[in-house]
């Protein structure tokens, strides 16, 4: 019985996270689509995870891949999702999106307001060029979201 209850809670957490992410273009890169590429790192967290709880998160999804290959894929998806953002901080270099932080419109799930954030960084000029995408949602504020991004970039 305890195992069944735990399974149901985990599934509910996954559903809640997926519903907040529903309708976003960035979903096209998640789900293991590029996992056969050894340069790609993908992480998806939802449900009752200690890290999520400690940061007031419901969902955390990250994608990192080689800049040359993945920035042309990620950039249009990020910009499409950022079109209707309620807050933004965007930087271009040489006509390419270098940095973006979007505050997406909140959604309501199970009677709770879920704040949603999207972060993109293209480090094409670094020693190890990479394009990184981070989506996260939860009850955290903008200030908490910015602090979380700083901690994840380290």
Where are these regions (language model features)?
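Sec/Tat-exported extracytoplasmic proteins
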Residues: 81-82, 123, 152
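C-terminal partner/receptor-binding element of secreted or periplasmic proteins
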Residues: 128-154
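Mid-chain, structured segments of secreted extracytoplasmic proteins
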Residues: 63-108
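Short, surface-exposed coil-to-beta transition loops
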Residues: 99, 112-118, 129-131
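Bacterial Sec-dependent N-terminal signal peptides
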Residues: 1-26
């Amino acid at each position: 019985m305890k195992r069944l209850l735990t399974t149901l809670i985990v599934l509910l957490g996954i559903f809640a996270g997926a519903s907040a992410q529903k309708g976003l273009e960035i979903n096209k890169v998640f789900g293991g689509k590029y996992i056969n590429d050894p340069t790609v790192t993908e992480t998806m967290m939802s449900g009752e995870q200690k890290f999520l709880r400690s940061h007031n998160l419901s969902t955390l999804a990250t994608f990192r891949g080689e800049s040359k290959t993945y920035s042309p894929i990620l950039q249009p998806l990020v910009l499409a999702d950022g079109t209707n953002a309620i807050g933004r901080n965007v930087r271009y270099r040489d006509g390419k999106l270098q940095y973006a932080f979007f505050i997406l419109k909140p959604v309501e799930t199970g009677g709770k307001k879920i704040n949603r954030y999207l972060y993109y960084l293209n480090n094409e000029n670094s020693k190890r060029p990479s394009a990184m995408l981070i989506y996260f949602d939860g009850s955290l504020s903008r200030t908490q979201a910015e602090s979380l991004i700083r901690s994840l970039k380290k």
